């Protein structure tokens, strides 16, 4: 990992609850300097997904359809985005799920809902493919008679929370 104290960058190879190991000072052409114990320590970061506009509240779901751990994010405005274990970002590319406010993985399908344009509709993907939406391959949609506000898997059921009802 990488740490920054004032203008000096440090790299490290390991970390436990109290210690960084394998620390190298003054990396990336920075200069080693004296630091006070009150100096702010920060971690540098890398943007993983740019171009998201007007995002509102984010909702996340962790899933594994193909032996690889992934996280999917919805933000009420943009296409859902999937991050794999290498932190590479891929947008789910169908307009039927763009702007979803809630997402849940259930029985090897991804369920998307809560869009402002279709607040009563839940769209689900093909099995084992969060970005596949062919009805002939097992994808589809359902409508409930209330505005969807949350999706939650509990044991073997998908609960659909709406403004006035729970399905």
What are the residue ranges of the model-derived segments?
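Alpha-helix initiation/capping motif
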Residues: 1-2, 99
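Small/polar beta-strand repeat architecture
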Residues: 2-57
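Recognizes the extracellular SEMA beta-propeller fold with strongest preference
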Residues: 43-167
């Amino acid at each position: 990992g990488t740490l920054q104290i004032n203008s000096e960058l440090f790299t490290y190879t390991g970390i436990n609850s109290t210690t960084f190991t394998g620390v190298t000072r003054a990396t990336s052409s920075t200069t080693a300097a004296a630091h006070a114990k009150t100096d702010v320590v920060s971690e540098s970061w890398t943007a993983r997904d740019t171009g998201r506009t007007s995002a509102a509240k984010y909702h996340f779901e962790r899933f594994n359809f193909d032996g690889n751990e992934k996280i999917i994010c919805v933000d009420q405005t943009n296409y859902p985005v999937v991050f794999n274990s290498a932190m590479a970002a891929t947008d789910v590319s169908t307009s039927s799920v763009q702007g979803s406010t809630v997402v849940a993985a259930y029985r090897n399908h991804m369920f998307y809902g809560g869009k402002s344009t279709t607040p009563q509709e839940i769209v689900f993907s093909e099995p084992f493919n969060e970005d596949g939406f062919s009805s002939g391959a097992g994808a589809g949609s359902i409508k409930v008679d209330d505005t969807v506000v949350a999706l939650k898997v509990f044991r073997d059921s998908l609960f659909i929370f709406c403004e006035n009802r729970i399905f």
